[in-house]
């Protein structure tokens, strides 16, 4: 069976696939023009959505496509076909995302960046740090990744609130509500963690009105999608001191232009879309599991609903 592999890390994936499934014929690379000549001979494509979207503009769609990213926004672009099965990466990002969130929550509570700045100025900073114990953390987007983040945070003694597509009981959350209730829940949260996907309903969500409902001094972390935030409104909220800080892993435009105000906004930290890199080993395992399911005409993990966008 021939598999088209469109990935910047194609050599790594090809090696892992050859070791785990030597019967597969892998056609790999990261040059769309070169791959386009082979795409028609491959019923299955594996790779990163930006490269796969480029191939879809040149070639007929495959029978099945496996994304190596959790987000599949490039494949939802206007004019691209949707008459194929698409699965996205699931089950491979939970722990690394939880570690990312925990890193910056603790850094904020313990005033890490403030102490680094003080050291650079030879100032003895003895301001007491905080603790996660007793804090209320709101996770906006409690799918597979959000659930894993919650499980990591629960032992720290936090109270967990969540936003999902439907209100439901979902341990370890004390409450899970719908997006319509977000303004009410942010008023109760000491820390707000955004993990929402890119859908029409999540664009410009964090605007001046919503940011104005945040608890004074709250920390905002966005590792979902940059389009969820109205940039100018977040800058204004930070400059006015209404928020305790913001950590942004994602932005509307990446890389962020040098003239963008995020670079110089006080209390804002940029982490360059590094929160949850794909593990090639975990991704290879997921692909092979889905390949078995595909061949057996069984349900596959991470199947995308094109209407919902995830």
Briefly describe each language-model feature range:
Residues 155-172:
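NAD(P)-binding Rossmann-fold cofactor-contacting core
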Residues 87-100, 114-115, 254-310:
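C-terminal helix-to-coil terminal segments
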Residues 114-148, 175:
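Glycine-rich NAD(P)-binding loop of Rossmann-like domains
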């Amino acid at each position: 069976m021939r598999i088209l592999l469109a990935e910047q890390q194609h050599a790594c994936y090809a090696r892992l696939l050859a070791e785990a499934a030597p019967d597969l014929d892998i056609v790999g690379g990261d040059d769309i023009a070169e791959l386009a000549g082979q795409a028609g001979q491959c019923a299955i494509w594996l790779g990163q959505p930006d490269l796969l979207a480029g191939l879809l503009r040149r070639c007929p769609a495959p029978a099945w496509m496996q994304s190596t990213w959790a987000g599949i926004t490039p494949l939802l672009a206007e004019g691209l076909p949707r008459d194929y099965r698409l699965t996205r990466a699931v089950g491979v990002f939970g722990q690394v995302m939880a570690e990312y969130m925990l890193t910056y929550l603790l850094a904020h509570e313990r005033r890490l960046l403030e102490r680094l700045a003080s050291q650079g100025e030879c100032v003895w900073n003895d301001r007491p740090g905080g603790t996660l114990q007793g804090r209320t953390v709101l996770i906006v987007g409690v799918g597979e990744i959000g659930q894993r983040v919650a499980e990591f945070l629960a032992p720290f003694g936090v109270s967990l609130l969540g936003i999902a597509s439907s209100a439901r009981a979902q341990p370890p959350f004390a409450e899970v509500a719908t997006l319509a209730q977000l303004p009410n829940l942010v008023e109760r949260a000491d820390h707000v963690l955004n993990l929402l996907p890119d859908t029409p309903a999540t664009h410009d969500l964090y605007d001046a009105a919503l940011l104005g409902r945040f608890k004074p001094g709250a920390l905002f972390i966005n590792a979902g999608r940059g389009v969820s935030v109205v940039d100018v409104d977040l800058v204004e909220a930070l400059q006015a001191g209404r928020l305790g800080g913001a950590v942004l892993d994602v932005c509307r435009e990446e890389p962020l232009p040098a003239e963008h105000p995020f670079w110089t906004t006080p209390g804002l930290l940029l982490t360059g879309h590094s929160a949850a890199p794909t593990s090639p080993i975990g991704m290879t395992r997921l692909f092979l599991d889905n390949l078995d399911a595909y061949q057996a005409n069984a349900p596959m993990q991470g199947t995308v609903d094109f209407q919902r966008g995830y």
